[in-house]
Design a protein with these regions (language model features):
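Catalytic Walker B motif of ABC-type/P-loop ATPase nucleotide-binding domains
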Residues: 171-175
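Conserved ABC ATPase "signature" region
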Residues: 110-142, 190-193
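The feature captures the beta-strand-to-loop junction immediately N-terminal to the Walker
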Residues: 33-35
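Conserved catalytic motifs of ABC-family nucleotide-binding domains
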Residues: 167
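Conserved ABC transporter NBD signature motif
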Residues: 56-63, 75-76
């Protein structure tokens, strides 16, 4: 279980995150929604080790992870994707997949260089695994294409594939629907469901209400740095006043 306790983050005296409490049960797909500036991304950054809280704590199981570096949370099985995918643009899709394990360990290039023989021994295994994941994502036909040639939706699938290369326990998905056409969005939704069925937990921040309602339960509603509501899709959908206030629906 991921547990967030009394989490606060201040920037220049302003609370971006203010006394936030919630938990994510292992095996679930939990959604975190809210307007721009609600504090969702800051919360994600703290969980993933890209930022430290001003106060409060985050636990993964019984281990406190608040204040850890991103490569340390990565070692625990927490992988974060980004709203704007970050592939190595000069590499092919397959090369991007195979680079992920070394790229998130917090090691410098020199350390990777002196470990070249060890890396080479793993190359065949990594290649086989990468091709298997690309087939699962329906990207295998694009394996030799430069990643810069991919569409927005294909890049999101590649991000998901890169996350899967590390055998994650939890994936933090940042706006998986952003810049994605409806056809590929359905593909992404299907793949998230299937990965979840493999035992991977998801925490998703998203503005796309359709995706959140289809995929997530429970759903956390965040505004002005605080969690305003937590409930099932039906409970969130039925609170018309809340949706009107936050999303103008």
């Amino acid at each position: 279980m991921l547990t967030v306790k009394n989490l606060c983050k201040e920037f220049d005296g302003l609370h971006a995150v203010n006394s936030v409490n919630f938990s994510v049960e292992l095996g679930t797909i939990t959604g975190l929604i809210g307007p721009n500036g609600a504090g969702k991304t800051t919360t994600f950054n703290i969980i993933a080790g890209h930022d430290s809280p001003t106060s409060g704590a985050v636990f993964f199981g019984k281990q406190e992870i608040s204040g850890m570096k991103s490569y340390e949370t990565f070692h625990l099985g927490i992988v974060r994707t980004f709203q704007i995918p970050r592939p190595f643009s000069g590499m092919t899709v397959l090369e991007n997949m195979m680079m992920v394990p070394g790229s998130q360990l917090g090691e410098n290039l020199w350390n990777n260089w002196i470990r070249l023989k060890q890396v080479k021994r793993q190359e065949a295994t990594n290649r086989e695994k990468a091709l298997e994941i690309l087939e699962f994502l329906k990207l295998e036909a694009l394996r030799n294409e430069p990643s810069m040639h991919l569409s927005g939706g294909q890049l999101k699938l590649l991000e998901l594939g890169r996350a899967m290369m590390s055998k994650p326990r939890m994936i933090l998905l940042d706006e998986p629907a952003a810049g994605v056409n409806p056809v590929l969005l359905e593909e992404i939704i299907d793949r998230i469901r299937e990965i979840n069925e493999m035992g991977v937990t998801f925490l998703i921040i998203e503005h796309n209400m359709d995706l959140i309602m289809k995929l997530c339960s429970p759903i956390l509603v965040m505004a002005e740095g605080s969690i305003m509501m937590q409930g099932s899709p039906e409970q969130v959908r039925s609170d018309k006043r809340l949706l009107d206030a936050f999303f103008g629906e």
